[in-house]
Amino acid sequence: MPIRIDKKLPAVEILRTENIFVMDDQRAAHQDIRPLKILILNLMPQKMVTETQLLRHLANTPLQLDIDFLYMESHRSKTTRSEHMETFYKTFLEVKDEYFDGMIITGAPVEHLPFEEVDYWEEFRQMLEWSKTHVYSTLHICWGAQAGLYLRYGVEKYQMDSKLSGIYPQDTLKEGHLLFRGFDDSYVSPHSRHTEISKEEVLNKTNLEILSEGPQVGVSILASRDLREIYSFGHLEYDRDTLAKEYFRDRDAGFDPHIPENYFKDDDVNQVPCLCWSSSAALFFSNWVNHAVYQETPFXWRKIXDDASAYGYL
């Protein structure tokens, strides 16, 4: 799939070396199709790494996507140059009058804080409320999923005894579900978090479908029946070495972290870590774009407001 992004974005050259088709504005303007508009709220500290990870997985269908990156203006990134943010990212005020077919909300390293103590919480709350009428399908990842469930349904997050870090098995629970088309009965994916949600709260407080779960990770992916809300607590987008970098970062900072489970051969951190989730990741993101976004989104974006009323969002 051609993804349409600023040709100066650092991720472009990485993606081109991987034979991923990236299209600039000039070429895209000559294609007589309505591209899908995707907004990515990138809350991860290593912005450029996350950009590349997500764009790589969004490039798996023949559809043309227009990608915009969003950041919280009430938070200043300490790990990404301000020039990068000013060049390639938009603020909520800059996009609030636009309509998007899909949105991805990433994880964030703030799960140790109560939601209300996150410095950009009020701006995040306003953005999520806005998304009900301006975005058709929203994919929430990790902390983004916990925050979305808390704001929409009052589902709490709970501190775990120790960090969940590793590659874990999960079972698919709804045979033939569109998000899991092409999946086997079980799959593995990276998880990296200190907090979890309660399955009982999900069942009692929401009408969401639990689509996958595992013995170590608990609830893994859930979604509304119309696929306008999708919540994933793992990190299918992660690269082979992402968990390794997190482990070495924490070890070097003196935190004595556990070695990520099911990741390094024989738990030897000098070995190259396994990569055993890339096919599942490609399927999942492709299914989201094809079935939750492309098949369902209204051709005219402003129809989303009418759909929001019909689905009970307004």
UniProtKB/Swiss-Prot annotation:
Gene Ontology molecular function, alphabetical: homoserine O-acetyltransferase activity; homoserine O-succinyltransferase activity
Which cell locations does it reside in? Cytoplasm
Question: Matching InterPro entries, A to Z?
Answer: Class_I_gatase-like, HST_MetA, MetA_family
Q: Is Cytoplasm tagged as a keyword?
A: yes
Residues under site feature: Important for acyl-CoA specificity: E111
> Which GO biological process entries does UniProt record here?
L-methionine biosynthetic process from homoserine via O-succinyl-L-homoserine and cystathionine
Q: Which Pfam families match?
A: HTS
- Chief localisation class: cytoplasm
The family note in this entry says: Belongs to the MetA family.
As for what it does, the entry says: Transfers an acetyl group from acetyl-CoA to L-homoserine, forming acetyl-L-homoserine.
What protein is this chain from?
Homoserine O-acetyltransferase
Lineage runs: Bacteria, Bacillati, Bacillota, Bacilli, Lactobacillales
Gene name, Swiss-Prot/TrEMBL: metAA
